[in-house]
Amino acid sequence: MNPLCSEFTSSSRKAPEAAIGQVLIEALPYIRKFEGKTFVIKYGGSAMKDELLKNSFAQNVTLLRKVGINVVLVHGGGDAITRTAEKLGLVSQFVHGKRVTDNDMITVVQMTLAGKVNQDIVRLLSEHGGKAVGVTGLDADTIKAVPGPNAEKLGLVGDVESINTDYIDLLCRAGLIPVIAPVGYDHNGNIYNINADDAASSIAIALKAEKLIYVSDVEGIQVGERILKTICKAEAADFIEQGIISGGMIPKVLSAFKTLDGGVRKIHLIDGKFTHSLLLEIFTHEGIGTQFIAEQDNDQQENR
């Protein structure tokens, strides 16, 4: 063997091995800290479409469960619903980003979210060693709904009235990963399409979760050229007033702080377009996205 080649190969292996070791050491206190805690993860965006990202996400979720964290997954599926509707000759319409849902469309929503999308996620987690169970908001009154405030325009789009935390806790105690499709029904048996972000927030509050994590297509809250590592409520209000946070990011930020007000300790916004972004956000000091905290606190700022 060429000595020069041998030396080059050996040295090139040391750097990544050291880096992996450092990440594992850095993760250890977080693993201890979060054992037995509950994380609610809203799964959406590119991480649901790209095969590499899907597998990376499934590996991350499975690892969280294996180290003793209770993971509750709430998923979207808007693109899949639109595709199914098109195949059936239905046109998708939206008002302020929410899908107009009539009787035909709610059937498509149920069929796509509870059937195809939900079961695909369960299968993917199972392939990576996770014990997942598919749940819809209709199962065991997991999500009880009420008509939304704009029912005359949106139709069967609902808001969350209550969450059956006993059922979700039962699944978590059994070592399972509940994968929840965001549909629910009211006291009259009417079925509603529920925004996945809103459902995840309500579930996190009801479960008194340690964290709510939004896996999306944005890197976090951007101010100028940088992504904020941490933002508190007062800072967010200032940024909104100054126009630094604007457009579609405003409702996301307001929803995050509403969830904090409901008792969830931290909210995280991370970019699902990066492989293993979930682990990098949770188990490293720097994180990869933006964490939302109720107020400035050095301990909360410095740790994920």
From Swiss-Prot:
List the InterPro entries hit by this protein, alphabetically.
AceGlu_kinase-like_sf, AcgluKinase_fam, ArgB, Asp/Glu/Uridylate_kinase, NAGK-C
Specify the enzyme's EC class, one word.
transferase
| Location in or out of the cell | Cytoplasm
Cellular component terms per the entry's GO annotation: cytoplasm
Keywords, ordered alphabetically: Amino-acid biosynthesis, Arginine biosynthesis, ATP-binding, Cytoplasm, Kinase, Nucleotide-binding, Transferase
Q: Show the catalytic activity.
A: N-acetyl-L-glutamate + ATP = N-acetyl-L-glutamyl 5-phosphate + ADP
- Which residues are listed under the site Transition state stabilizer? 42, 252
GO biological process entries:
arginine biosynthetic process via ornithine; L-arginine biosynthetic process
CDD domains, per the entry: AAK_NAGK-C (cd04250)
Q: Which SUPFAM superfamilies match?
A: Carbamate kinase-like (SSF53633)
Alphabetical list of Gene3D superfamilies matching this protein: Acetylglutamate kinase-like
Query: Which pathway does this polypeptide act in?
Result: Amino-acid biosynthesis; L-arginine biosynthesis; N(2)-acetyl-L-ornithine from L-glutamate: step 2/4
The protein's role, per its UniProt record = Catalyzes the ATP-dependent phosphorylation of N-acetyl-L-glutamate.
Q: What family does the database annotate? A: Belongs to the acetylglutamate kinase family. ArgB subfamily.
The protein in question is named: Acetylglutamate kinase
Gene source species = Chlorobium limicola (strain DSM 245 / NBRC 103803 / 6330)
